[in-house]
Amino acid sequence: MKLTILILLVITSFCSCGILREKYAHKAIDVLTPMIGVPVVSKIVNNAAKQLVHKIAKNQQLCMFNKDVAGWCEKSCQQSAHQKGYCHGTKCKCGIPLNYK
């Protein structure tokens, strides 16, 4: 079980780096999660892993929780639109500040 979860974390990491596409990660999750002995736990891990991969895969410029973690959002907005970059959840938007705090 520990090895299966470790492999799932590696797959998620590859997906976040862009090495592995989301649909292939989901297929790998479908193959790996039945290896967990308890069916209920297997299904929960399957759903949680797919949601995690989806959230990480749609992440833009390392925006997390409205924070520009690596400064990539600001840099890409300066290069493309010459505007300040703002993180909206996991998405980067140029010139559109958050209207909530």
Swiss-Prot record:
Where would one find the signal peptide in this protein? 1-17
Q: Where in the cell is it found?
A: Secreted
UniProt superkingdom = Eukaryota
- Domain BetaSPN-type CS-alpha/beta, which positions? 60-100
Q: List the disulfide bonds.
A: C63-C87, C73-C92, C77-C94
Q: Which Pfam families match?
A: Scorpion_toxin_alpha-beta
Q: Name one GO molecular function term.
A: potassium channel regulator activity
**Record's Gene Ontology CC terms?**
extracellular region
Q: In which tissues is it expressed?
A: Expressed by the venom gland.
Keywords on record: Disulfide bond, Ion channel impairing toxin, Potassium channel impairing toxin, Secreted, Signal, Toxin, Voltage-gated potassium channel impairing toxin
Per the record, the similarity remark reads: Belongs to the long chain scorpion toxin family. Class 3 subfamily.
- What is this protein's function? Inhibits voltage-gated potassium channels.
- What is this protein identified as? Hg-scorpine-like-2
Q: What's the source species for this entry?
A: Hoffmannihadrurus gertschi (Scorpion)
